Structure formats: C-alpha cells, structure tokens
C-alpha cells in the first residue's frame, strides 16, 4: 500500500490535465467516465465530477484498480463532501438496443454533466469524443491519468453496481450481484438455461443468440 506522501504525489501527477485547463482560463473542470459498456445486461451509467481546487483526495484512481472496499470508501467520501460536485446519467437497456451502446454511452455522459449542481466550462472525457457545447478533451485511458475522470469512474461504477444488486433481487437466477451483467461463464450458462430477462441487451450477440434459439423467460 502506498504511503500518504506517495498518494499525495500521485494525486498531483494525475492533476496535470486539470491544471492545464485552469492555466488556460477555465475554472470548472469536470471529469466524465462511464461504467457498463461491455455487459450483456443492465443500463450503461456515466459519472461526472468536479473536484475542488487545492484539495487532495488520497487514493483516487481508476475504479478498476481499486478493491471493492477502497472504491466504496472513496465513493462515499466524494458524495459526502459538499465541495465535490457529482452527477450521474443512466441509459436503459431499451435505449441501448435502440441506438447502440456507443451512442447510449454518450447520452449517459450528457445526462451526468447536466445533473451536476454547477455548469462546467471544460470537460475531460475518458476515451471518446463527446459532441457537446462545452469544450472538451478526449483522454485515452483517462481514468488512470486524470483525477477528475478517476473520480467520475468511481461514481459511475459504484452507482451501477448498486443498480445491478437491485436487479438481482428481481432476477436472482442470473447472479447479477456477482458479475454485474458481464458475460462470465456463470452468466452465459444462466442465459442458456433461463433465456434473457427484460434487463438483457437484446442487441448483444450472446443475448441475441439465446433469443434465436428460442430460450425465453
């Protein structure tokens, strides 16, 4: 585990894009990221986050690099801090099937930005170009390179995981609480046995195949 000093240095290193935007005259820089592009079931969720200038949040990192316990701690820390501005966007399975996952991801991001308390004047977006009236910068692997995007990734991931745990209560046979809708061996086996439920993405290959095979809830 990294020391407090090491974590503070890492936070500063990953603030380079935010600092550059501030130097260019922007004041409200929001990181934007998504969770749930790849799963076979459940919505796609986006997070947006504006971190207060001059405040260090130790441990902030790409949500995929954190343990569930670390991620939950940071999620609650971000939500409970009145100086942190967080937003979430959720796009349904029906909408994903209607317009495709990439466009649905962009819609979720736009929703997340709109749900912030304040209006950002610059966006740092993980991995894709986001058509928006607010100026933006696409950062490849941004969740590992920008603290604002990393914070947004934590918010999106934790929020979506909570949604998937709720779907598990409704459809426990699929194990949504464990794999969160991703195509694990156990999920594929359940899909083969039970067929898709209303929360499965019918435009995704394994789900589409099970429908063609006539396996339905």
Curated annotation (Swiss-Prot):
One Pfam family this sequence matches: RNase_HII
Listed cofactors: Mn(2+); Mg(2+)
Coiled-coil intervals, chain numbering: none
PROSITE patterns, per database record: RNASE_H_2
Annotated localization: Cytoplasm
Gene3D superfamilies the UniProt entry points to: Ribonuclease H-like superfamily/Ribonuclease H (3.30.420.10)
Protein's UniProt keywords contain Cytoplasm: yes
Enzyme Commission code(s) on record: 3.1.26.4
RNase H type-2 domain: residues covered: 27-216
InterPro entries, alphabetized: RNase_HII, RNase_HII/HIII, RNase_HII/HIII_dom, RNaseH-like_sf, RNaseH_sf
A GO-annotated cellular component: ribonuclease H2 complex
Protein residues bound to a divalent metal cation: 33-34, 126
Database matches in CDD domains: RNase_HII_bacteria_HII_like (cd07182)
Reactions catalysed, as given in the entry: Endonucleolytic cleavage to 5'-phosphomonoester
GO terms classed as biological process: DNA replication, removal of RNA primer; mismatch repair
Bound cofactor: record note: Manganese or magnesium. Binds 1 divalent metal ion per monomer in the absence of substrate. May bind a second metal ion after substrate binding.
Single GO term (MF): RNA-DNA hybrid ribonuclease activity
Alphabetized UniProt keyword annotations: Cytoplasm, Endonuclease, Hydrolase, Manganese, Metal-binding, Nuclease
NCBIfam families: PRK00015.1-1 (NF000594), PRK00015.1-3 (NF000595)
Function: Endonuclease that specifically degrades the RNA of RNA-DNA hybrids.
UniProt family annotation: Belongs to the RNase HII family.
Name listed for the protein in its UniProt record: Ribonuclease HII
Organism: Chlamydia trachomatis serovar L2 (strain ATCC VR-902B / DSM 19102 / 434/Bu)
Lineage of the organism: Bacteria, Pseudomonadati, Chlamydiota, Chlamydiia, Chlamydiales
């Amino acid at each position: 585990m990294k020391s407090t000093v090491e974590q503070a240095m890492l936070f500063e290193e990953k603030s380079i894009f935010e600092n550059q935007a501030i130097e260019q005259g922007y004041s409200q820089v929001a990181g934007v990221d998504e969770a749930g592009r790849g799963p076979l079931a459940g919505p796609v969720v986006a997070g947006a986050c504006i971190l207060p200038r001059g405040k260090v949040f130790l441990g902030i990192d790409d949500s995929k690099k954190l343990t569930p316990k670390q991620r939950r701690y940071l999620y609650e820390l971000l939500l409970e801090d009145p100086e942190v501005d967080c937003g979430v966007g959720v796009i349904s399975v029906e909408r994903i099937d209607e317009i495709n996952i990439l466009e649905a991801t962009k819609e979720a991001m736009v929703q997340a930005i709109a749900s912030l308390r304040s209006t950002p004047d610059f966006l740092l977006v993980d991995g894709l170009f986001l058509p928006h009236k607010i100026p933006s910068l696409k950062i490849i692997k941004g969740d590992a390179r920008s603290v604002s995007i990393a914070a947004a990734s934590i918010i999106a991931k934790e929020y979506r995981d909570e949604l998937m745990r709720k779907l598990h209560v409704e459809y426990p046979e699929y194990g949504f609480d464990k794999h969160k809708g991703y195509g694990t061996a156990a999920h594929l086996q359940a899909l083969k046995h039970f067929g898709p439920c209303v929360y499965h993405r019918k435009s995704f290959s394994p789900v589409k195949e099970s429908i063609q095979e006539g396996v339905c809830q």
